[in-house]
Amino acid sequence: MDGFDAVLKAAQRGDEWAVAVLYRDVRPRLARFLEVREPKAAEDLEGEVWLAVAQGLARFSGGEESFRAWVFSIARRRMADFRRTAVRRATFPAPTEELDRPGAPGPEAIVLEELSADAAAEFVIATLPADQAEVVLLRVLGGLGVNEVAEILDKRPGTVRVLQHRALRRLHAALVGTGVTR
């Protein structure tokens, strides 16, 4: 039994240390993915995702990549639910960072802290068609393999590879056009 299998079994038994290991492994990628795809509700969505993971963990079976793919599948479903609800309500919650709180770091500090990753993700979203951007974000931010992304997006692995290839070519052309690369 490899390391991930042992951690998964312990987490399914309810061992807190094992749940913490799984959380620490996936959380940064999941948080960044949600912040990029749904910045106004990322924290709430992340909480819902982890609640669903906790509820379904005992039934999960698979390896490390399958686990990450499962978590990101849950995240995509929660985003879709959020978007449907938001359209019906026609409101969007304001993130805590945008509220004017005395003593809180200013927006400049928050932006400077997260600028490079957020700017890159925003560039990807602004430059690419939605399907290509989603493939790149799931592959890069999610750290998922082609097969996992294909399963999440309900596409064939070959289609995911083609979308990724086209996306990278388009990003390269955009970067060369702005003088960022040689």
Q: Which residue ranges define each predicted feature?
A:
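DNA-recognition helix of helix-turn-helix
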Residues: 76, 80, 132, 141, ...
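N-terminal module of bacterial RNA polymerase sigma factors
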Residues: 1-28
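Arg/Lys-rich amphipathic alpha helix in sigma70-family domain 2
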Residues: 36, 58-62, 73-94
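Structural recognition of an alpha-helix C-terminal capping motif at a helix-to-coil junction
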Residues: 44-51, 65-77
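Amphipathic alpha-helical segment used for protein-protein interaction
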Residues: 13, 103-137, 142-152
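Core residues of bacterial helix-turn-helix
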Residues: 23-26, 46, 53, 139-142, ...
